[in-house]
Amino acid sequence: MPAVTQPRGESKYDAIPGPLGPQSASLEGKVALVTGAGRGIGREMAMELGRRGCKVIVNYANSTESAEEVVAAIKKNGSDAACVKANVGVVEDIVRMFEEAVKIFGKLDIVCSNSGVVSFGHVKDVTPEEFDRVFTINTRGQFFVAREAYKHLEIGGRLILMGSITGQAKAVPKHAVYSGSKGAIETFARCMAIDMADKKITVNVVAPGGIKTDMYHAVCREYIPNGENLSNEEVDEYAASAWSPLHRVGLPIDIARVVCFLASNDGGWVTGKVIGIDGGACM
């Protein structure tokens, strides 16, 4: 394919950042860190980043075997990867994780803060322990991942935080703690996009709707009236018909593809934004 040339502008503000054409979507030569990458959405993020040319640091807290499988799969697909164990609920672990990541591959271009926990419960029943469990990972953890990302990312790096449509959706019962923990991330992104602009780092949030991971059916049942009586297939049918005009359910790859867009040159003019990825469930 012939090289695509950039038009000659009259001032420095006319210069187009990065290549034109399909090359602008490439992640070749980039290094990414994905937290909570041993399973679910984080696993697919790591896999897709690897497929597109990234070297990937696969973070995990407990699932050693799963994380090693992700690393092996990325290598099999032709890129490189390594595991780093760290609990993002512990700031000292976060600091060490970033230091190890840079030692392994020499730099960081992309950080995907994916780790999270889910919680359901009527506000009258929420204990201080449950509140702290959720906010420690979903909110405090993401903040300090972002802090260390700023310190270690290359100029022009990418920080992608994990939100949820529950941070915006109305009338979600028994979900105040989880929704609040994710809603804070949206404010983080808007403020951090300003703070991190001095290093030309973009900061965005992906906010998934229901995504079919290992927790999918159990979580969906909390949203569906009498959901506890439905089979997994019936849950899928309900979700596809009631929650999306596209009549299908969301998959981890749907999130990973948007993450890769934000991580590439194509996403370079997007910052401080919350990207809802829910198949039209929240319009």
Curated annotation (Swiss-Prot):
Catalytic activity: scytalone + NADP(+) = naphthalene-1,3,6,8-tetrol + NADPH + H(+)
Protein residues bound to NADP(+): 39-63
Record keyword Chloroplast present: no
GO BP: melanin biosynthetic process
Residues of the active site: 178 (proton acceptor)
Associated pathway: Pigment biosynthesis; melanin biosynthesis
Keywords assigned by UniProt, alphabetized: Melanin biosynthesis, NADP, Oxidoreductase
Paired cysteines (S-S): none
Binding site for substrate: 164
Chain segments annotated as transmembrane: none
Region (Disordered): 1-21
Short name of one Pfam family: adh_short_C2
EC number: 1.1.1.252
Subunit structure, as described in the record: Homotetramer.
Task performed by this protein: Catalyzes the NADPH-dependent reduction of 1,3,6,8-tetrahydroxynaphthalene (T4HN) into (+)-scytalone and 1,3,8-trihydroxynaphthalene into (-)-vermelone. This enzyme is the biochemical target of several commercially important fungicides which are used to prevent blast disease in rice plants.
Sequence similarity: Belongs to the short-chain dehydrogenases/reductases (SDR) family.
Name used for this protein in its record: Tetrahydroxynaphthalene reductase
Species of origin: Pyricularia oryzae (strain 70-15 / ATCC MYA-4617 / FGSC 8958)
Top-level taxonomy: Eukaryota, Fungi, Dikarya, Ascomycota, Pezizomycotina
